[in-house]
UniProtKB/Swiss-Prot annotation:
EC number: 2.2.1.2
Primary localization: cytoplasm
Record-level GO cellular component terms: cytoplasm
One Pfam family hit: TAL_FSA
InterPro entries documented for this protein: Aldolase_TIM, TAL/FSA, Transaldolase_2, Transaldolase_AS
Protein name: Transaldolase
Reaction equation(s) it catalyzes: D-sedoheptulose 7-phosphate + D-glyceraldehyde 3-phosphate = D-erythrose 4-phosphate + beta-D-fructose 6-phosphate
Family in the record: Belongs to the transaldolase family. Type 2 subfamily.
EC top class named in words: transferase
Localization: Cytoplasm
GO terms for biological process, alphabetical: carbohydrate metabolic process; pentose-phosphate shunt
Species of the source: Campylobacter jejuni subsp. doylei (strain ATCC BAA-1458 / RM4099 / 269.97)
Length: 325
């Protein structure tokens, strides 16, 4: 499979005991969550109602964390065989998105969540903001796996890699007797968001549904060229809205070696068994194609707007959960 890994971009308590097990038997190798996913699960699934009632009286964020941590622990246990046998099998949980501009609070929350979950195969999701690169470095340095998220620009992907790799180097330096200590080297993914580009820019361009693919290919090339197997490109935001594209479009178009794709359930269902690997375009081919579709200044503005919007959406989802609890 050329070191390609397909993850499930969904989590919900009863799902983990049923459909998720079926997905694991069909080569799903990991899972991701975010505030919007937890909002949908906690506010719409009846399985959480009794749990919430038992936790009444606690602070709303504490209630949320107990629910989320329980689900993450369950997912981590289901994925544990993949983690120990194939060095995959990760589940991601995001820190409070409202901390995105505070390095100290983000780092403290990330370490606290990782400790509370108590599972090696958990990745802590950190948004790729200016305040967060130091957080990524410190987590990797301390042996905590990281999912760097909300990446839209090549600059973001480069800064994420630099921070993650620097932490990885420090971890290895500090753990020379790695095998004797039975300590696993942390892993990281750099989550490049894809379809959001196209949904934003399709109305402005003649060539539809290509900018997200080309932009993701560019970031992938940058990460892959570093030749660090413990830091992989992950393609996120790979769901299709509407009926104008196949549901698995953003999986098939980015089927690159040594990469991860986290996809919604309908995309996974449509994709089953179609391992037709793509050869990534070279950078000069990507820039030629991009420049024919849209200007560099418009792409840069889109990157900035999408990052701001992504953070805002996750903050709103997080606040909605807390208000409902």
């Amino acid at each position: 499979m050329k070191n390609f890994s397909l993850w499930c971009d969904f989590i919900e308590n009863s799902f983990l005991d049923n459909e998720f097990l079926n997905l694991l038997s069909h080569e799903i190798n990991g899972a991701t969550s975010n505030p919007a996913i937890f909002k949908n699960a906690i506010l719409n699934s009846p399985i959480y109602k009794d749990k919430i009632l038992k936790l009444k009286g606690k602070k709303t964020k504490d209630i949320y964390e107990e629910l989320a941590i329980s689900d993450i622990q369950k997912a981590a246990d289901k994925l544990a065989p993949l983690f120990y046998q194939k060095n995959d099998g990760f589940i991601s949980i995001e820190i409070d998105p409202r901390l995105h501009d505070n390095t100290t609070l983000s780092l403290g929350e990330a370490k606290r969540l990782y400790s509370a979950i108590g599972k090696e195969n958990v990745m802590i999701k950190i948004p790729a903001t200016k305040a967060s690169y130091e957080v990524m470095y410190e987590l990797m340095k301390n042996g905590i796996s990281v999912n760097a998220t909300l990446i839209f620009s090549l600059e973001q992907s480069q800064k994420c890699f630099e921070a993650l790799n620097a932490g990885l180097v420090e971890f290895r330096k500090n753990n020379i007797a790695l095998k004797e200590q039975n300590t696993r080297t942390p892993q990281a993914v750099i989550s490049i968001f894809v379809s959001r580009f196209d949904r934003l820019l399709n109305p402005k361009t003649k060539e539809q549904n290509r900018i997200g693919i080309l932009n993701a290919n560019l970031a992938y090339n940058n990460i892959y060229s570093k030749n660090e197997p413990n830091i992989r490109a992950l393609f996120a935001s790979t769901g299709v809205k509407g009926d104008n594209l196949p549901k698995d479009y953003y999986i098939k178009e980015l089927l690159f070696e040594n990469s991860v794709n986290t996809a919604p359930l309908d995309a996974i269902e449509a994709f089953k068994g179609k391992m037709d690997f793509k050869k990534p375009l070279m950078n000069f081919e990507i820039y030629t194609a991009l420049n024919q579709i849209i200007s560099q200044s418009e792409r840069e503005k889109a990157c900035n707007d999408l990052l701001s919007d992504g953070i805002e959406q996750f903050c709103i989802a997080f606040e909605d959960i807390l208000k409902a609890l």
